[in-house]
Regions:
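N-terminal segment of the mature soluble domain
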Residues: 52-55, 60-130, 178-184
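Extracytoplasmic/periplasmic, Sec-exported soluble proteins
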Residues: 42-53, 65, 83-87, 91, ...
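Bacterial Sec signal peptide processing site at the extreme N-terminus
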Residues: 12-40, 194-195
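Amphipathic beta-strand/beta-sheet edge segments enriched in Tyr/Trp
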Residues: 19-26, 145-193
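Bacterial N-terminal signal peptides that target proteins for export
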Residues: 1-7
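Alpha-helix termination/capping residues and helix-transition junctions
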Residues: 12-15, 67, 141
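Acidic/histidine-rich, surface-exposed loop or edge segments in extracytoplasmic proteins
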Residues: 31-45, 71-81
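A short, hydrophobic beta-strand-centered structural micro-motif
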Residues: 56-57, 73-77, 127-159
């Protein structure tokens, strides 16, 4: 009886040792929040704005029908015409990610990543380091049918009691061969703060 109780106690002790929680480091006033929750900390551009823009543009572009057949798209940097620092690359990355998840489009190396692609091809083909049967051949990259480009601008109005910020995000899909804008949309966001 004592041996059976000792074995059960040992198993319970071992099991409780395996269920250790990870240590938490840092301040006590920090907590995780819902990444999709509306963020109203300031009237500057924030995560909620980024998510609203990306979701709105992705939905509009996917529903337009222009991307039938999963064409290749090259994404250009969105021009930041605001007085704030806004990482516009995060907006286009979110749009690309959502379109990739839906299977609506394929993406060529964008204008900022193109040099990395060229460097990798040169390294494989000119360095002599790689087995020739595994080397990616030059001249086989797929050209984009469309380019996606846009801008974000803002108008800021202040009084002694209020600050009003109006953002306008514009995005367009251009047919590379014809130069025609095949799709265009914009998302407007207004944020007002009372002092």
């Amino acid at each position: 009886m004592f041996a059976r109780f000792s074995i059960l106690a040992l198993v319970a002790l071992l099991a409780s040792g395996c269920s250790n929680t990870s240590p938490v480091l840092g301040g006590k006033n920090i907590s995780y929040g819902d990444s999709k929750a509306v963020e109203l900390v300031t009237n500057e551009f924030g995560s909620t704005d980024l998510q609203m823009i990306a979701e709105s543009m992705t939905r509009s572009l996917a529903q337009s029908g222009i991307l039938q057949g999963r064409p290749v798209v090259q994404v250009y940097d969105v021009k930041n015409k605001t007085s704030e620092y806004i990482d516009t690359r995060e907006i286009t990355t979110s749009i690309k990610t959502q379109l990739m998840k839906t299977g609506t489009a394929r993406f060529a190396s964008d204008n900022t990543d193109m040099q990395s692609q060229v460097d990798q091809l040169k390294l494989q083909n000119q360095s002599g380091l790689y087995k020739q049967s595994t080397v990616s051949k030059t001249g086989n990259m797929i050209a984009a049918k469309y380019r996606l480009e846009g801008s974000i601008s803002s108008i800021v109005k202040r009084s002694s009691d209020y600050k009003d910020v109006f953002y306008k995000f514009s995005l367009q899909l251009i047919d590379v061969e014809s130069g025609l804008a095949e799709w265009m949309d914009e998302k407007e966001i207004r944020k007002t703060t009372e002092r």
